[in-house]
Amino acid sequence: MKFSEQWVREWVNPAVNTEQLCDQITMLGLEVDGVEAVAGEFNGVVVGEVVECAQHPDADKLRVTKVNVGGERLLDIVCGAPNCRQGLKVACAIEGAVLPGDFKIKKTKLRGQPSEGMLCSYRELGMSEDHSGIIELPADAPVGKDFREYLILDDKEIEISLTPNRADCLSIAGVAREIGVVNQLAVTEPAINPVPVTSDEKVAINVLAPEACPRYLLRSVKNVNVNAETPVWMKEKLRRCGIRSIDPIVDITNFVLLELGQPMHAFDAAKLAQPVQVRFAADGEELVLLDGTTAKLQSNTLVIADQTGPLAMAGIFGGQASGVNAQTKDVILEAAFFAPLAITGRARQYGLHTDSSHRFERGVDFELQHKAMERATSLLVEICGGEVGEICEVVSETHLPKLNKVQLRRSKLDALLGHHIETETVTEIFHRLGLPVSYENEVWTVTSASWRFDIEIEEDLIEEIARIYGYNSIPNNAPLAHLSMREHHESDLELSRIKLALVGNDFHEAITYSFVDPKLQSILHPEQAVWILPNPISSEMSAMRVSLLTGLLGAVVYNQNRQQNRVRLFETGLRFIPDESAEFGIRQELVFAAVMTGSRLSEHWASKAEPADFFDLKGYIENLLSLTKAGPYIKFVAKEFPAFHPGQSAAIVLDGEEIGYIGQLHPMAAQKLGINGKAFACELIVDKVAERNVANAKEISKFPANKRDLALVVAENIAASDILDACREVAGSKLTQVNLFDVYQGQGVPEGHKSLAISLTIQDTEKTLEEDDINAVISVVLSELKDRFNAYLRD
């Protein structure tokens, strides 16, 4: 919003200069974007009167004038403006004057005729870009008076940027109110008295949408002179606020808009078929706007209409058919309160943005309409004359906004500000803001004002106190925080340790969205119920993920499409499983997931490129699980999953509970997802492996270790991990290590069987083991394996 400093000072005039005033406005939360002079730097320009005006003898477009500037004689001035005429009051730059751009006025001759000055246009004085003619001043302008003094041009245009909640400051009254509060000065409002009714003319009103228009006022003014001249003081105030003068009717409604913040409109009474209706548009209705464009109205658009159809978009734009023009004799003034939600977004639907819509969609004072109507009527009668009818009003008290009562606790105020403000000071600030307040039991009860739609919660009141008390008056105190060390159990396995282990194996951490494409998710989890968002960002992000793999595999596709074939990614995050027994019907689980594609090792001159396989990923996960307390008890049990290859997938099981899964992505699933080549993936619940093995010191044997290799033949459906576990169970403390180092099927091994080569390391902490001791351990192991798995030594 742009406004004139001088206009504001007519309402409230603090003893501060322009710079200090702008600082105050900014600290009030009304950020000052710019300050400009309302006119260029010039001197020597006075009010003059064209006494004579004749055609230049040698130039068709020039006129020779004699101008009275209050001196002893008339000045001869040659002028080329088309509107120069006898009797006109003008801005005259006399000899010695200096205009903007250091342009000096001297006596000269133009086409042979003497010229002792210059009649100025707005552009030549740096007041606007208007160069269509010379400035025309009122007939009562005092001849000889300094032009700067006459128009009070030692003024500044101040432009402020307002947040949407401060629509109350979209007017001179609103800005003055704020300045008055911070300077503890009373605001001097112009006298606005009821205009005497001189006509019995009434306007019939029918409000069909009271929820959208709780208050609607119309007033008839007959026999107005729409061709009257807008006073120069009004033109100047409008100009300094960035609004061009059009005609007195429009200028008056714009003036009231800027002064009080109430948008108004004027209809040509002769073009209305009463009653005037306030209703929503019917689909397909059309309205020709004042700018000549045609709007095809939508059913959610509030309109002002009569018996013939729409007259205007309510609170947005007037219609051409009912607009005021040079032939208008009788006008109907409109002032209304339109509910913000009824106007919000409607202008943008039609590619419009007007001063009225800007204010109505943010909220206008719902008690301002009568005052604005009287102000506009008074100005209209003063400038254009006319016979005034009574104000016709329809109001729905039920739908008018209710004043909020908000409580503010002393403890909350002190806590948020970090500073104690005296109770009397706080109460006084509320009174200065025009907010009724009471104080009892360390609590202020504040009633919002009709112009403040944004006072709703306790924090809003604290903001008001801080603004008016002054942010600079609140001391800078370092934040006081009562911190306590987070309890950390020695057995807790930090998530960062898991991540570092994977990073050490050439994996990269990824972060993907919790919102996923339900179509892609159904490829991986066709049987899993999912949580669909009611208002998604897009259709591709409309479901909550039930697995991290949906996002990770999408990241694989993204990288492969950019020529990255060897991809290793992992992620930790929440998955969301619909569960009626859980809070809000959804179970959130922290899980870990990893995916792997491409070669086993990075490209290197000393090694041959080999594709990664299921056992590579399984090895990485086993290495990861070895960090946990649960590691020795976790088993990989063959199991089929819909999205995995049936021969290369397994459940990760701990104490009989399935805590995750691992496998190669099914070729069909990979094809649907757009993945090239084989992809391997796993996922497991973090909480199940969140404990680590606490370091336990034990004696290191000083006696030699003995290694024995066994080649065992077992049925091919027996897991090697079961063989290794059985060895550990029966061999006792002397068995320090057992490893699988070869798997063989083929010649020499019966069909349906496989040969597992395992290495046993046997060692004692108290003596060197004899061969008999070693053989005893081997014998126990072989006996157990034969009994449990029908295993025997391969020949």
Swiss-Prot record:
Keywords: Aminoacyl-tRNA synthetase, ATP-binding, Cytoplasm, Ligase, Magnesium, Metal-binding, Nucleotide-binding, Protein biosynthesis, RNA-binding, tRNA-binding. It catalyses: tRNA(Phe) + L-phenylalanine + ATP = L-phenylalanyl-tRNA(Phe) + AMP + diphosphate + H(+). It comes from the Bacteria. One of its GO terms (molecular function) is tRNA binding. Mg(2+) binds at D454, D460, E463, E464. Residues 401-476 form the B5 domain. Gene3D superfamilies: 3.30.56.10, Bira Bifunctional Protein, Domain 2, Ferrodoxin-fold anticodon-binding domain, Nucleic acid-binding proteins, Phenylalanyl-trna Synthetase, Chain B, domain 3. One of its GO terms (cellular component) is phenylalanine-tRNA ligase complex. It is an enzyme of class 6 (ligase). SMART domains: B3_4, B5, FDX-ACB. Residues 39-148 form the tRNA-binding domain. It is found in: Cytoplasm. PROSITE patterns: B5, FDX_ACB, TRBD. The keyword Lipid biosynthesis does not apply. Its EC number is 6.1.1.20. Its cofactor is Mg(2+). Disulfide bonds: none annotated. Tetramer of two alpha and two beta subunits. NCBIfam families: pheT_bact (TIGR00472), YtpR (NF045760). Belongs to the phenylalanyl-tRNA synthetase beta subunit family. Type 1 subfamily. This is Phenylalanine--tRNA ligase beta subunit. The gene is pheT.
